[in-house]
């Protein structure tokens, strides 16, 4: 696990984009993408660049259960607003949050991931150490699954909604086992509220109580953090 400290999120996005360009030069064709505030500067760099992504496939980590793609809080909407509208891909995959059978949808999405090995996976990290929506206690062997979101995650995400009651209580998420199959993982974290999770991920025991700790076992992980998020690493 390589740690890169940056001044701010803007610099972090630039470095992540440089890593992506290197990966594309080596033949990467499938990107694993994340939502939330952490990767926004990275997507801004992609949008500003002259690069064409129309031969690439993207697979997103997760989607809320119960939100249509037109909801401005759906991750499908987020990706279109922040990346896909400006930079079309050959194919974009996200779980269907309105599937009538969410367990069947999880299995369908898992098959999509199996058919498109991820070359470059972007991750954020939750305050409780979750990656994707893999909450503490999730098995490291888990593949795509339906998640009951923890109160801490609902509270953290409520800032994007009118009220905390509007935050969905479930999501469909790529599992930890699937994430670990990615060729390369770039994790972005900014802000003091991520410091505990980053410390546990880097130094803590590998435990399902802190899902991101499993990344210690991956051969090619780069962690991009600002000084606040890295404040407990010294």
Curated annotation (Swiss-Prot):
Highest taxon above the source species: Bacteria
Example GO molecular function: identical protein binding
Pathway recorded for this protein: Amino-sugar metabolism; N-acetylneuraminate degradation; D-fructose 6-phosphate from N-acetylneuraminate: step 5/5
Biological-process GO terms, alphabetical: carbohydrate metabolic process; glucosamine catabolic process; N-acetylglucosamine catabolic process; N-acetylneuraminate catabolic process
Top enzyme category: hydrolase
Residues annotated as catalytic: 62 (proton acceptor), 128 (for ring-opening step), 130 (proton acceptor), 135 (for ring-opening step)
Reactions accelerated catalytically: alpha-D-glucosamine 6-phosphate + H2O = beta-D-fructose 6-phosphate + NH4(+)
InterPro entries linked to this entry: Glc/Gal-6P_isomerase (IPR006148), Glucosamine6P_isomerase (IPR004547), Glucosamine6P_isomerase_CS (IPR018321), NagB/RpiA_transferase-like (IPR037171)
Keyword annotations: Carbohydrate metabolism, Hydrolase
CC annotations in GO: cytoplasm
EC numbers, comma separated: 3.5.99.6
HAMAP family reported for this sequence: GlcN6P_deamin
Entry similarity comment: Belongs to the glucosamine/galactosamine-6-phosphate isomerase family. NagB subfamily.
Function according to Swiss-Prot or TrEMBL: Catalyzes the reversible isomerization-deamination of glucosamine 6-phosphate (GlcN6P) to form fructose 6-phosphate (Fru6P) and ammonium ion.
Protein name: Glucosamine-6-phosphate deaminase
Organism of origin: Streptococcus pyogenes serotype M1
Species classification: Bacteria, Bacillati, Bacillota, Bacilli, Lactobacillales
